[in-house]
């Protein structure tokens, strides 16, 4: 699977939402993740909103501090259906108030839930909200396959089971879903990521990396044919992982040549510390308001 991808000339990533606001910071934190990715490629300039965290209000507040007008957003990517990545969508769409593509997996509207310590829905998207978003101008682009968004940028599509490396085949989260009226384990097959091609190499942006961040990086390489990986940004969902899983993840990313790690959200303090020890000055902790330039 190879795409004629192209590459971007300039990229800047604004962290609009994250669980940590940073020390002595004016920015608001919240549970979840949201990035504004500003790119320029072959004279084309776009602003891509990647995920919408749990609530719109803190995102809009942080956008105002960063002098970003919501109406300047050109497209939206929803990494997966969990509430801490989709909850702010309606409120943000009200501010965007124009026709705009929303890229996601076809299963993003599935019923997904936890049963411990009690029943709780994991996702907030449903048919009614889907239609409400459409009334505000949202145009759903639901695909299992990768999609090239512009020169140098593409979605990863679904990470199939056979594409996952062995140690990432075990789910990192205990969720269930309804499938033909039956309760089955949810492996979060609806998670997609984003890859960006730069002079320095690939940059991979993830929401929670439920399919496994290493498998997502390998999928990016497979799609693009580019073996050089510069940075991996987002949540890795290693918060409940044992040391063996974390060490395996770090070793695999190092073997793939990943230079920089920018992580937070669901990665977990233990894993973050282990990444920091290995990547040293090339490790960065995400926080609301953080701007990453390449």
Swiss-Prot record:
Its EC number is 2.5.1.105. GO terms for biological process: 5,6,7,8-tetrahydromethanopterin biosynthetic process; pteridine-containing compound metabolic process. It comes from the Archaea. It catalyses: 4-(beta-D-ribofuranosyl)aminobenzene 5'-phosphate + (7,8-dihydropterin-6-yl)methyl diphosphate = N-[(7,8-dihydropterin-6-yl)methyl]-4-(beta-D-ribofuranosyl)aniline 5'-phosphate + diphosphate. GO terms for molecular function: 7,8-dihydropterin-6-yl-methyl-4-(beta-D-ribofuranosyl)aminobenzene 5'-phosphate synthase; metal ion binding; transferase activity; transferase activity, transferring alkyl or aryl (other than methyl) groups. Pfam families: Lactamase_B. SUPFAM superfamilies: Metallo-hydrolase/oxidoreductase. InterPro entries: DHPS-like_MBL-fold, Metallo-B-lactamas, Metallo-beta-lactamase_dom, RibonucZ/Hydroxyglut_hydro. Keywords: Magnesium, Metal-binding, Transferase. Substrate binds at residues 116, 186, 228, 265. Its cofactor is Mg(2+). Belongs to the metallo-beta-lactamase superfamily. This is 7,8-dihydropterin-6-methyl-4-(beta-D-ribofuranosyl)-aminobenzene-5'-phosphate synthase. It comes from Methanocaldococcus jannaschii (strain ATCC 43067 / DSM 2661 / JAL-1 / JCM 10045 / NBRC 100440).
């Amino acid at each position: 699977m190879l795409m004629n991808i192209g590459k971007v000339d300039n990229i800047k990533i604004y962290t609009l939402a994250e669980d940590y606001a940073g020390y002595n910071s004016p920015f608001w934190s919240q549970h979840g993740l949201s990035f504004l990715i500003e790119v320029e490629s072959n004279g084309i300039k776009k602003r891509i909103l990647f995920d919408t965290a749990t609530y719109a209000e803190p995102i809009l507040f942080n956008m105002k501090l960063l002098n970003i007008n919501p109406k300047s957003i050109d497209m939206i990517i929803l990494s997966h259906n969990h509430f801490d990545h989709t909850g702010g969508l309606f409120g943000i769409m009200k501010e965007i108030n124009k026709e705009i593509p929303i890229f996601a997996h076809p299963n993003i509207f599935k019923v997904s839930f936890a049963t411990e310590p009690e029943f709780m829905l994991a996702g907030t998207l449903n048919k009614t909200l889907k239609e409400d978003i459409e009334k505000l101008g949202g145009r759903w682009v639901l695909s299992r396959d990768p999609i090239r968004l512009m020169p140098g940028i593409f979605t990863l599509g679904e990470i199939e089971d056979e594409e996952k490396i062995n140690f990432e085949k075990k789910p990192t989260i205990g969720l269930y879903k309804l499938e033909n009226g039956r309760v089955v384990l949810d492996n979060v097959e609806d998670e997609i990521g984003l890859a960006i091609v730069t002079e320095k190499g690939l940059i991979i942006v993830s929401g929670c990396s439920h399919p496994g961040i290493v498998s997502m990086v390998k999928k990016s390489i497979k799609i693009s044919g580019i073996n050089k990986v510069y940075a991996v940004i987002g949540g890795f969902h290693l918060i409940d992982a044992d040391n063996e899983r974390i060490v395996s993840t770090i070793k695999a990313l190092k073997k793939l040549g990943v230079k920089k790690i920018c992580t937070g959200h669901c990665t977990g303090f233990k894993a973050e510390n282990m990444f920091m020890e290995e990547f040293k000055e090339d490790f960065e902790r995400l926080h609301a308001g953080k701007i990453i330039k390449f």
